[in-house]
A protein has these predicted regions:
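Active-site-proximal structural scaffolding
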Residues: 1, 10, 27-30, 34, ...
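Active-site neighborhood of glycoside hydrolase catalytic domains
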Residues: 1-61
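Alpha-helical packing segments of well-folded alpha/beta enzyme cores
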Residues: 1-8, 142, 166, 246-258
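Hydrophobic alpha-helix feature that most strongly marks membrane-spanning transmembrane helices
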Residues: 6, 10-13, 42, 147, ...
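Short amphipathic alpha-helical segments
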Residues: 30-31, 63, 300-303
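Conserved alpha/beta catalytic core and glycan-binding cleft of carbohydrate-active enzymes
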Residues: 34, 38-218
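Carbohydrate-interacting/catalytic domains
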Residues: 154-156, 160, 169-335
C-alpha cells in the first residue's frame, strides 16, 4: 500500500490521494500506516494533498505527526452534510434522526463535527472529539457526494428546490468545498449504487449487506430497489450534461464571491427558529450569510445592519427598517 501510494505521486504525478474509510483500518503499530503514508508522499512532493474519509470525527487525522496525528492535509466532514440536508429536506430517517435542528448547522459552521464528544443517538454512545485546534481549511464539506447520493435506495440527488441554498451554504462556508459530479449544473441523472462482481457470492453479499446497512430507511423496504449488479443500474448513473443553466451561473457567482471573503474562522453565528421556520446568520468580516430554511418568506433585522445585497440565490432586498427580506429556502450574502 505504501509503495502504491508513492508510485501514484512519483510516477503518475497525481496531485493528491483520497483515502477511503480509514476508520476501518485497524492498526496498533507504533508507527501507524496512515501516518507513514502521508510522510512518504509528502517527502516526494510537499504540495501533494492527502485527504481522508474517516467516520470517527477524530481531529487526529489532520494533526501533525509531532502532535500524535496522521498528518493528513484534510478530512471529509459528514456532519456538515447531515446538518444541512436535514434542514433542507426535513429527512429524519436513519442517522439523520439526530440532526435537523438549526443549532446543529450553527455548530457545524464553527467546526463541522456536530458530534464532537457528545452523545450520538444513532450510535448509542458518545462520539467524536472537539477539533478547534485544527484550521477550518482542513475540513472538506459538501452538499452531495458519491456516498450520500449513491447510498440512497434510488440514487436520487438533492431535490431541485433545495439546490441553490445548499450551494450557498457550502460554497460560502469557511471550509474547503467539494462538488459532486454534475452538481454545479443540476445534473438530472441519479447516481445509483452499482457493482460488477464476478463472484456471485460477493454479489449477493453486496445486495444483502446494502439493505441491512440502510434498513432504517423506509425506501429500502421495497423490492424495487435497483440491483447493483444490473448493467442498467450503471447506465442510469451516467451523466447526461442536462441541467439548469441558472444554477450553473449561481455556482460561478458563488465561487467568484468566495474568493473575496475573509479566510479563517467565522466571526459570529446566530440561529433563529421563529417566523415560521429556521434561519441562520453567519458573519464573516464585513459580510453576513443569511439563510432562510423556512417554508415561507422572512424579514429580519441583522446586526450589524447591512445596506447591500452582494449576492443571493433568489430575490432578496434590504427593507426600509434595514431588515433583510428573503423568500423561502433562500440565502443572501449582505454587507
Amino acid at each position: 500500500m505504501l509503495q502504491s501510494a508513492e508510485g501514484w505521486i512519483r510516477d503518475f504525478h497525481l496531485d493528491g490521494l483520497r483515502l477511503d474509510a480509514i476508520h476501518a483500518i485497524y492498526d496498533s503499530s507504533a508507527r501507524p500506516l496512515l501516518r507513514e503514508l502521508a510522510e512518504r508522499v509528502h517527502a516526494i512532493r510537499d504540495q501533494v494533498h492527502v485527504i481522508a474519509e474517516s467516520g470517527l470525527n477524530d481531529p487526529k487525522v489532520t494533526r501533525p505527526a509531532a502532535q500524535g496525528g496522521y498528518g493528513h492535509d484534510a478530512a471529509w466532514a459528514d456532519d456538515f452534510h447531515h446538518a444541512l440536508r436535514t434542514l433542507l429536506t426535513g429527512e429524519r430517517e436513519g442517522y439523520y434522526a439526530e440532526f435537523g435542528r438549526v443549532g446543529d448547522l450553527a455548530k457545524a459552521y464553527r467546526r463541522p463535527f456536530v458530534n464532537d464528544g457528545t452523545y450520538s443517538t444513532s450510535r448509542g454512545r458518545r462520539f467524536g472529539a472537539p477539533a478547534f485546534d485544527r484550521p477550518v481549511e482542513e475540513f472538506v464539506v459538501f452538499a452531495q457526494n458519491h456516498d450520500q447520493v449513491g447510498n440512497r435506495a434510488f440514487g436520487d440527488r438533492l431535490p431541485a428546490p433545495a439546490r441553490p441554498l445548499a450551494a450557498f451554504c457550502t460554497l460560502l462556508s469557511p471550509f474547503t468545498p467539494m462538488l459532486f459530479m454534475g452538481e454545479e449544473h443540476g445534473e438530472e441523472a441519479p447516481f445509483q449504487f452499482f457493482s460488477d462482481h464476478i463472484d456471485e457470492k460477493i454479489a449477493v453479499a453486496t445486495r444483502e449487506g446494502r439493505r441491512r446497512e440502510f434498513a432504517s430507511f423506509a425506501s429500502f423496504a421495497g423490492e424495487e430497489v435497483p440491483d447493483p449488479q444490473d448493467p442498467v443500474t450503471f447506465e442510469h448513473s451516467k451523466l447526461t450534461g442536462r441541467g439548469d443553466a441558472g444554477l450553473r451561473e449561481l455556482y460561478a457567482d458563488l465561487l467568484r464571491v468566495r474568493r473575496t471573503l475573509p479566510r479563517g474562522d467565522v466571526d459570529d453565528i446566530v440561529a433563529f427558529d421563529d417566523m415560521g421556520g429556521p434561519q441562520l446568520a453567519v458573519r464573516r468580516g464585513p459580510y453576513t450569510l443569511f439563510m432562510n430554511f423556512a417554508d415561507g418568506p422572512v424579514s429580519r433585522v441583522l446586526a450589524p445592519r447591512p445596506n447591500e445585497v452582494v449576492l443571493s440565490t433568489h430575490e432578496a432586498r434590504i427593507e426600509g427598517d434595514g431588515a433583510v427580506w428573503l423568500p423561502a429556502q433562500a440565502g443572501a450574502l449582505v454587507r
